[in-house]
Design a protein with these regions (language model features):
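Membrane-proximal envelope and lipid/glycan-remodeling enzymes
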Residues: 1-493
Length: 493
């Protein structure tokens, strides 16, 4: 894991917010707007806590991800591998899973997700389901949602069972108390940003792309994972089969959560990062396999182990044989082996620790913008560029990830897309607005829509009556007619 450690460009999208937050600009990506570009609030706060003391993004990324991953692996071994046979089987699954190894670092939230879900599974599968355990399960689930909202889907069946087992008011109260961390965050997000979900959710999910096209892309994501990392999907499928055969309701409920999240990943079109959304499922599936297999080196266990090793070694570029990811089919239907892309410049073993800056064109471009004192640019958001350009550069992100208006406009070229990278046309006059900070958007409907949106993202008075009312109206779709009128006028659908 140490020799394969790397950092993804997307991690620096969050790090720009972290840097602005620590330096007193608030939880903002562009310092003049309150916009949530990160999808993992808990992870962002953990990065911020360490970055406050250590102003080196790579030490923060590597230190935190490796620490959390080591804790996860230790707990996995101590709590779920009760015999040498289970230890060999369990650790073989983790070692031969490219997805798990790749996203146990990367600078993204996956290591924290892994740890929280492992703690949840141990509590749910090993403890008596009394009120106290119920509280802790909902508390851990709250942290899972706080870390990354959609991963909460994995835990829904288990949580529903806890409520069913303890059908009384006390359990509902304990569940509500346990879920307070996430509810507090949602309240903060609503009041600070104006919306309960990250801006990236609106940019990625509100594209107007048909469900059929997204599901087709989701199936490509599954096929891509099978090609690059056959162990992960095999283990996930095997765990569900073994769970059903076990007839243990608790194990079946965990398997149901795994299946639920797997279907969700297909439905949203997967991701552009190969395997990223399957890493937590792999860990949960490994736990289920260990819970449903014998303690000794039986023939089924040996057969399973042999198949996992064979599949792992048959991968196009298995991590266990070579830490250097070769550029093999890096982009397949818009799905990328991200570690292959960034390993040369962003890997722990390749980083220049004297300069502590990766030798990457986006870093150079960011530093050039900063040196020239540029305050505005337009283009797709790249994490490295945005971070190294500094806080004074305002980036109009044509992907919409960091721009609250473009996130709510449909992309163009919807028949050819990369998940999470949907290009938007910049409305006429919007560029002038960003230069002058006066609303010069040409279309009257879009101009009025953005005027209302500006109350949420620019107003200094967070709790003014006008802003609270506008937040309410935006979240019930009150202003959608303005957006629809603009789209009708410009024939953008």
């Amino acid at each position: 894991m140490v020799r394969t450690a790397w950092v993804a460009d997307d991690a620096f999208l969050t790090m720009r917010t972290v840097d602005n937050f620590v330096n007193g600009y608030g939880l903002r990506w562009n310092i003049l707007e309150r916009v949530q570009i990160y999808t993992h609030p808990m992870w962002m706060f953990m990065l911020s806590g360490l970055y406050y003391f250590i102003r080196d993004p790579f030490i923060v990324f590597y230190g935190l991800t490796l620490l959390l991953s080591m804790i996860t692996i230790y707990l996995f071994g101590v709590k779920f591998t009760k015999s040498p046979a289970k230890a060999v089987l369990g650790f073989s699954i983790l070692i031969f899973s490219k997805t798990f190894i790749d996203y146990s670092t990367s600078g993204l939230e996956n290591p924290l997700t892994h740890l929280l879900i492992l703690i949840f599974l141990y509590t749910f599968l090993e403890k008596d389901h009394d009120l106290r355990t119920g509280f802790w399960l909902f508390f851990i689930a709250s942290l899972v949602a706080f870390n990354r909202m959609d991963t909460f889907l994995i835990l829904i069946p288990a949580l529903a069972w806890i409520l069913y087992e303890n059908r009384n008011i006390k359990m509902l109260v304990y569940a509500a108390l346990g879920f307070l961390p996430f509810m507090f965050w949602e309240l903060f997000s609503l009041l600070y940003y104006g919306f309960p979900f990250p801006n990236t959710a609106y940019a990625k999910l509100g594209t107007g792309i048909s469900s059929l096209l997204l599901m087709q892309q989701g199936m490509r994501y599954v096929i891509d994972s099978i090609q690059r990392d056959p162990v992960t999907l095999f283990v996930i499928g095997l765990s569900i089969v073994l769970a059903l055969r076990s007839r243990n309701i608790h194990i079946i409920l965990v398997a149901t959560g795994i299946a639920l999240y797997f279907i969700y990943v297909i439905k949203i079109g997967g991701d552009f990062m190969s395997g990223r959304f399957f890493s937590a499922l792999l860990l949960a599936s490994a736990v289920l396999i260990l819970k449903t297999t014998d303690l000794n080196f039986s023939r089924p266990n040996l057969a399973m182990l042999g198949l996992i090793v064979a599949l792992g070694l048959s991968a196009s570029n298995p991590d266990v044989r070579n830490h250097i990811t070769k550029n093999v089919n890096v982009r397949n239907y818009g799905i990328t082996d991200e570690r292959a892309v960034y390993f040369r410049t962003m890997a722990l073993i390749n980083l220049d620790w004297k300069t502590r800056r990766p030798d990457h064109i986006w870093v150079q471009q960011g530093l050039e913008h900063k040196a020239k004192g540029r305050v505005l640019t337009i283009g797709p958001a790249n994490g490295l560029f945005a971070f190294y350009a500094g806080p004074n550069l305002h980036i109009v992100d044509t992907h919409g990830l960091g721009d609250p208006l473009l996130a709510r406009l449909p992309p163009y070229h919807v028949s050819h897309f990369i998940i999470g990278h949907f290009f938007r046309a910049v409305p006429e006059g919007y560029w002038k607005y960003k230069r002058s900070f006066g609303n010069q958007i040409k279309d009257k409907n879009l101009r009025e829509y953005y005027q209302k949106l500006s109350i949420l993202i620019h107003s200094e008075k967070l709790f003014s009556k006008e802003r609270i009312l506008t937040i309410w109206r935006f979240n019930i779709g009150y202003y959608d007619y303005l957006l629809n009128a603009y789209l009708a006028d410009t024939a953008i659908r």
